[in-house]
């Protein structure tokens, strides 16, 4: 193409031709042409780079204003020569450069493959074989699969991992060991599969469950953004990562969480006698843990440990503090009933039920779920007008009339804060 736009580049041989010279004795095939030749930079870029992007060159030439009809019609696939030859030598001379010779044989190796394999497997030895391929269709992905030179140490173990194929999306690691990518009998293969089409979203059910929390909704009303840390490992990471880019990470379930407030709200809090948080929301109640101690997620993880330290659980699972909205009609009615009769069992049931329900809504667990269920049964019977002393009632509710904590006093405080 350059010779057509600038004929002076063919001054040394204006008659374009290609000669094929076979040599049966030396088993060689020589191809001679009278082209414009290549410079040293051309040899490095065009012949020394195997993965040179022709699409990128096409776009650059097209943006420069070249004739689109002449792009991509002068290449015959240089590396197809290695399908019949063990060594290829190119001798070329460009008008603006010296004569150079480029030579390559099939005995070469891929250094970048070796370095990538060692960094991927933490192995000091080279691989035995490699397969690099791409798949296009409904789901497009690229894969690097390596066969190790030696069998893995855990090959015959009964509790070994099924495979060690890493799955990534847009070069972001998604899974360290994706079992669905390769059969179990090929678990000795190491590699990476990368796709541009994999979604990077968490399960919507889990996200919606966290988003419906009354604590999160309260932050949204203040116009604050919330980071969802729903995976078990997130709890450990956040405990070590105290801040990010100068911003302190704060758990929304902590008691010392401070939110923006106006002057009127500050004044109302100072005058109030009950413990409330910065801004009243539409929720009837919520539950927050104390400043020091485990969050609800961390408490659930630690209680699931078979070899946990029970002494640590005692003080790390600290007191829970019930936060209420004193302006809500339910709280106001409950207060009036308590003032009328402090020994009313229904009031005591409602107070404890309110606290236990707040624990559940804040992802804390209940030590006695059956007691909680029986308390709900009693409130249902009260709502239906059923006499609790009716002999036809099931024995379960009667048997569950556990000792009710008094409405006031130290015993009630310890029960609520335990």
From Swiss-Prot:
SUPFAM superfamilies the UniProt entry points to: ATPase domain of HSP90 chaperone/DNA topoisomerase II/histidine kinase (SSF55874), HSP90 C-terminal domain (SSF110942), Ribosomal protein S5 domain 2-like (SSF54211)
Molecular function (Gene Ontology), one example: unfolded protein binding
Function in brief: Putative molecular chaperone that may promote the maturation, structural maintenance and proper regulation of specific target proteins.
Domain of life: Eukaryota
Compartment annotation: Cytoplasm
Origin species: Homo sapiens (Human)
Protein family according to the UniProt entry: Belongs to the heat shock protein 90 family.
Protein name in UniProt: Putative heat shock protein HSP 90-alpha A4
Region span, Disordered: 255-289, 383-418
Gene Ontology CC, one term: cytoplasm
């Amino acid at each position: 193409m350059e010779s057509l736009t600038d004929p002076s580049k063919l001054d040394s041989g204006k008659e374009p031709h290609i000669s094929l010279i076979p040599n049966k004795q030396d088993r060689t095939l020589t191809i001679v042409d009278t082209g414009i030749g290549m410079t040293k930079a051309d040899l490095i870029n065009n012949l020394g780079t195997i993965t040179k992007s022709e699409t990128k060159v096409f776009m650059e030439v097209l943006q420069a204003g070249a004739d689109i009809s002449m792009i991509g019609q002068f290449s015959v696939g240089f590396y197809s020569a290695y399908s019949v030859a063990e060594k290829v030598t190119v001798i070329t001379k460009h008008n603006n450069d010296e004569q150079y010779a480029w030579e390559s044989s099939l005995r070469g190796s891929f250094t970048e493959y070796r370095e990538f394999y060692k960094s991927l497997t933490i192995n000091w030895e080279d691989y035995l074989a490699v397969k690099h391929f791409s798949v296009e269709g409904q789901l497009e992905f690229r894969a690097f699969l390596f066969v190790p030179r030696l069998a893995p140490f855990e090959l015959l173990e009964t509790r070994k991992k099924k495979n060690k194929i890493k799955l990534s999306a847009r070069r972001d690691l998604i899974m360290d060991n994706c079992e669905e990518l390769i059969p179990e009998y090929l678990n000795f293969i190491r590699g990476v599969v990368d796709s541009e089409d994999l979604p990077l979203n968490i399960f919507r059910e889990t996200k919606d469950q966290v988003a419906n929390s009354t604590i999160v909704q309260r932050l949204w009303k203040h116009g604050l953004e919330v980071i969802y840390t729903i995976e078990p490992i997130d709890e450990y990471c956040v405990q070590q990562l105290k801040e990010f880019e100068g911003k302190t990470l704060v758990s929304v379930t902590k008691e010392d969480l401070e939110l923006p407030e106006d002057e009127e709200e500050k004044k109302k809090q100072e005058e109030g006698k009950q413990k409330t948080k910065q801004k009243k929301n539409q929720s009837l109640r919520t539950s927050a843990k104390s400043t020091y101690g485990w969050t609800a997620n961390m408490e659930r993880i630690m209680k699931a440990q078979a070899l946990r330290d029970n002494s640590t659980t005692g003080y790390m699972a600290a007191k829970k503090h019930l936060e209420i909205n004193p302006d809500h009609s339910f709280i106001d009615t409950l207060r009036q009933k308590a003032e009328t009769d402090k020994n009313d069992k229904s009031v005591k049931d409602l107070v404890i039920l309110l606290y236990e329900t707040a624990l559940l809504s804040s992802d804390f667990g209940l030590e006695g779920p059956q007691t909680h269920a029986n308390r709900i049964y009693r409130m249902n019977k009260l709502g239906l007008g059923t006499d609790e002393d009716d002999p036809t009632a099931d024995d379960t509710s009667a048997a569950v009339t556990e000792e009710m904590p008094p409405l006031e006093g130290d015993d009630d405080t310890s029960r609520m804060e335990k």
